[in-house]
Regions:
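Surface-exposed, flexible loop/turn segments at secondary-structure boundaries
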Residues: 18, 36-38
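Short coil-to-beta transition motif at edge beta-strands of beta-rich domains
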Residues: 2-17
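Short beta-strand-centered aromatic/proline hotspots
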Residues: 21-34
Length: 85
């Protein structure tokens, strides 16, 4: 498990990156670690959405809950702490 603190910026992949497929992820600032959605998650304010553009901001500015762990399709690097790179 990675080390994440409140105020850190993380990247969370929606799907495992693969050759030949565009990466799908959000980046955001960690507001807190919470269980308010029924699972342990990083509550983030999204600062970048890989699918957004000038016309459609996607999830930018929205609150997103990133699971700390998942039981299905978990892989190393699903969540990256960009503040510690």
């Amino acid at each position: 498990m990675i080390k994440v603190n409140v105020g850190d910026t993380i990247r969370s992949y929606d799907f495992k990156p693969m050759v030949g497929r565009e990466d799908c992820f959000v980046e955001g600032v960690v507001e807190r670690v919470t269980t308010e959605q029924g699972y342990k998650a990083y509550k983030i304010t999204v600062t970048k959405d890989s699918w957004s553009d000038a016309e459609d901001k996607g999830r930018v500015g929205k609150i997103v809950f990133v699971p700390v762990e998942v039981s299905f399709m978990e892989y190393a690097g699903r969540v990256i702490n960009l503040s510690r790179i």
